[in-house]
Amino acid sequence: MSDVLERLAQVLEARKDADPDTSYVASLHAKGLNKILEKVGEECTETLLAAKDAEHSGETRDLVYETADLWFHSLVMLSRLGLGPKDVLDELASRFDLSGLEEKASRNP
C-alpha cells in the first residue's frame, strides 16, 4: 500500500521545480506555502462535506475522491517542508503499541 505513496512522493519531488505553466504541482510551489495550505484547507472542507453526504446517502464514491485530493495536497504540503509520506507512516507505526489515551498523554504540551 505505501508503494503508491512512495511513488507519488517521488513524482511530487520531481515536479517541485518543474515549469509552473506545465505542472500543477510546480504551480502550487511557485505560489508558495500559503497557497498550498489554502488548497489543503479547501480539500479538507470538501472531504468533510462528502463524509456527511455519504452518511446520509450511503454513497461513498465522492468521499473516496475527496479524500484522495486531501491526501494529494497534504503530500504536496509535506514535500514543500522537506517531508514525505514515510515520515507520517513512521509516526503512525510508532503508535501501534500505545493506546489512544497513552499516545495523547505522551505528546509535548
Swiss-Prot record:
<comment type="similarity">
    <text>Belongs to the PRA-PH family.</text>
</comment>
<keyword id="KW-0378">Hydrolase</keyword>
<dbReference type="GO" id="GO:0000105">
    <property type="term" value="P:L-histidine biosynthetic process"/>
</dbReference>
<dbReference type="GO" id="GO:0005737">
    <property type="term" value="C:cytoplasm"/>
</dbReference>
<dbReference type="Pfam" id="PF01503">
    <property type="entry name" value="PRA-PH"/>
</dbReference>
<keyword id="KW-0963">Cytoplasm</keyword>
<protein>
    <recommendedName>
        <fullName>Phosphoribosyl-ATP pyrophosphatase</fullName>
        <ecNumber>3.6.1.31</ecNumber>
    </recommendedName>
</protein>
<comment type="pathway">
    <text>Amino-acid biosynthesis; L-histidine biosynthesis; L-histidine from 5-phospho-alpha-D-ribose 1-diphosphate: step 2/9.</text>
</comment>
<keyword id="KW-0067">ATP-binding</keyword>
<keyword id="KW-0368">Histidine biosynthesis</keyword>
<dbReference type="InterPro" id="IPR008179">
    <property type="entry name" value="HisE"/>
</dbReference>
<keyword id="KW-0547">Nucleotide-binding</keyword>
<dbReference type="GO" id="GO:0004636">
    <property type="term" value="F:phosphoribosyl-ATP diphosphatase activity"/>
</dbReference>
<dbReference type="InterPro" id="IPR021130">
    <property type="entry name" value="PRib-ATP_PPHydrolase-like"/>
</dbReference>
<dbReference type="GO" id="GO:0005524">
    <property type="term" value="F:ATP binding"/>
</dbReference>
<keyword id="KW-0028">Amino-acid biosynthesis</keyword>
